Amino acid sequence: MMKHFLLVVNILAVTLPFLAADIQNQEQTTCRENEERLFHQVTAPYIPVHYVMNRYPQYEPSYYLRRQAVPTLNPFMLNPYYVKPIVFKPNVQVPHWQILPNIHQPKVGRHSHPFFMAILPNKMQDKAVTPTTNTIAAVEPTPIPTTEPVVSTEVIAEASPELIISPETTTEATAASAAA
């Protein structure tokens, strides 16, 4: 955008002195004093700016193909890759993807897309497939513990006097041994 602006400014800067001189000459021709000067006078040809802008929209020669920044998968566009026709004969290698030499290649790295990829045949289709699972150690699923509320059905009996006395005797025995 800045290039276009600078180009238009340069065109106007070049053409304005000629336009100003032409206007001054028109004022002098109204007097009609010097007819010889009008006959030998050379003026710059008038080129309108909109003609230049419509004629050369890019203002510079384009030596490269204009390509989109993001490639699209359009079936009507030329793709830089093509496949040679394959005739299957014994002991013949399948040709790989070829690059067209006359199309401008992008400078970024190529990313393979599933649309352009060839699927190679599986070479081990002839052999019998053996399972590779370990039959010695069988895998057992781990049980998941379930959390259920525990309800006790036992009835708590009242404490007997023996249970109350027995701790007192032990405390008396420990107190007597501590005093000695």
Swiss-Prot record:
<comment type="similarity">
    <text>Belongs to the kappa-casein family.</text>
</comment>
<keyword id="KW-0325">Glycoprotein</keyword>
<dbReference type="GO" id="GO:0007595">
    <property type="term" value="P:lactation"/>
</dbReference>
<keyword id="KW-0597">Phosphoprotein</keyword>
<feature type="glycosylation site" description="O-linked (GalNAc...) threonine">
    <location>
        <position position="153"/>
    </location>
</feature>
<dbReference type="InterPro" id="IPR000117">
    <property type="entry name" value="Casein_kappa"/>
</dbReference>
<feature type="glycosylation site" description="O-linked (GalNAc...) threonine">
    <location>
        <position position="147"/>
    </location>
</feature>
<feature type="signal peptide">
    <location>
        <begin position="1"/>
        <end position="21"/>
    </location>
</feature>
<dbReference type="Pfam" id="PF00997">
    <property type="entry name" value="Casein_kappa"/>
</dbReference>
<feature type="modified residue" description="Phosphoserine; alternate">
    <location>
        <position position="160"/>
    </location>
</feature>
<keyword id="KW-0494">Milk protein</keyword>
<keyword id="KW-0732">Signal</keyword>
<keyword id="KW-0964">Secreted</keyword>
<feature type="glycosylation site" description="O-linked (GalNAc...) serine; alternate">
    <location>
        <position position="160"/>
    </location>
</feature>
<feature type="glycosylation site" description="O-linked (GalNAc...) threonine">
    <location>
        <position position="142"/>
    </location>
</feature>
<comment type="function">
    <text>Kappa-casein stabilizes micelle formation, preventing casein precipitation in milk.</text>
</comment>
<dbReference type="GO" id="GO:0050821">
    <property type="term" value="P:protein stabilization"/>
</dbReference>
<feature type="site" description="Cleavage; by chymosin/rennin">
    <location>
        <begin position="116"/>
        <end position="117"/>
    </location>
</feature>
<feature type="glycosylation site" description="O-linked (GalNAc...) threonine">
    <location>
        <position position="132"/>
    </location>
</feature>
<dbReference type="GO" id="GO:0005615">
    <property type="term" value="C:extracellular space"/>
</dbReference>
<protein>
    <recommendedName>
        <fullName>Kappa-casein</fullName>
    </recommendedName>
</protein>
